[in-house]
A protein has these predicted regions:
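A generic structural signal for short, non-catalytic loop/turn and secondary-structure boundary residues
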Residues: 1-2, 117
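Acyltransferase
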Residues: 3-84
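Glycine-rich, charge-dense phosphate/pyrophosphate-binding loop(s)
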Residues: 47-137
Length: 137
């Protein structure tokens, strides 16, 4: 949907895929796996339709985020600053350490300053929406 704004937050450290996978439990209850699948579908529908309510439900991740957020000491503060300032959502991108914010407006300059003052160095990049989709180069 054309209304979405995407902001990535790139800290000055990496989280290896091995470390990010190693922190996850060996298995999950079926109910958690089913809930996560439903949330992913809500996220996709919310993004396609511009529906903030659906992306808020869709961001609920019980498979990865509760564990991987512990590898990112800044995550809770960043999430609070981003979501308060933009009324959007913040997610861990892949295994981390990059996070992505999805909202209908970009961060204010005041919020950007607060974020750059968090633990470590965090680069903030506002990304344009790509309407072309996936392609082979």
């Amino acid at each position: 949907h054309l209304d979405w704004k995407f902001t990535v937050f790139i800290p000055d450290f990496e989280v290896s895929t091995e470390k990010a996978r190693g922190i996850l439990p060996q298995g999950y209850p079926r109910s958690e796996a089913a809930a996560n699948t439903a949330h992913a579908i809500m996220m996709l529908k919310g993004l396609a339709d511009g529906n903030e309510r659906l992306i808020r439900h869709g961001k609920k991740d019980c498979i990865h985020e509760p564990y991987r957020r512990t590898l990112l000491p800044f995550f809770d503060s960043l999430q609070n600053l981003f979501e308060t300032d933009t009324d959007g959502i913040l997610l861990i991108s892949g295994s981390g350490s990059t996070c992505i914010g999805i909202s209908k407006k970009y961060l204010s300059e005041q919020a950007k300053q607060k974020i750059t003052g968090l633990e470590g160095s965090i680069s903030i990049r506002e990304l344009p929406l790509c309407l072309k989709g996936a392609s082979v180069l």
